[in-house]
Amino acid sequence: MLAAMIILLTGCGTGSVFDGSRASDASGFRMEYSILNREESADLNLTEGDRLRVSLSHTEGSADVIVGMEGKTPIYRGNGQQNADFVLEIAETGSYHISVSGHQAKGNISFTRISGEIK
């Protein structure tokens, strides 16, 4: 009986690193998770004049977020983010690396490309 309880309790720790869904395509990068305790990333091709809408909503934990082009100063860096909704202006065409590192985070995050093209 004691051995069974020990096995049961050790399976209930905070060892999970990711339980959720993620999607990445030309329009953006989205994740929803009941636990995010690692880094997830995606690359998004953006054009000068585009905007990137960033939305974070966490009911538990937090996330560190970095958005930028390889080898350049990031256009955004936020540590310990819980809830936010803002827009980044894209000043240079290129491939932008988006990195999200969760810390016992539960919630969702999205990065949505808003085209700068005039229609």
Regions of interest found by a model, annotated:
Residues 12-43:
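Transition segment at domain starts
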Residues 40-42, 82-88, 96:
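Short strand-edge motifs at loop-to-beta-strand transitions and within beta-strands
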Residues 34, 76-81:
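Short beta-strand segments within Ig-like beta-sandwich modules, predominantly Fibronectin type-III
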Residues 43-58, 96-100:
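Hydrophobic beta-strand segments within beta-rich accessory/binding domains
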Residues 1-12:
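Sec-dependent bacterial lipoprotein signal peptides
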Residues 63-64, 100-117:
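Edge beta-strands of jelly-roll/beta-sandwich modules across compartments, strongly enriched
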Residues 47-48, 55-69, 91:
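Acidic, Ser/Thr/Pro-rich low-complexity intrinsically disordered segments
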Residues 37, 48-52, 92-96, 106-107:
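Short tyrosine-centred short linear motifs in exposed loops/low-complexity segments
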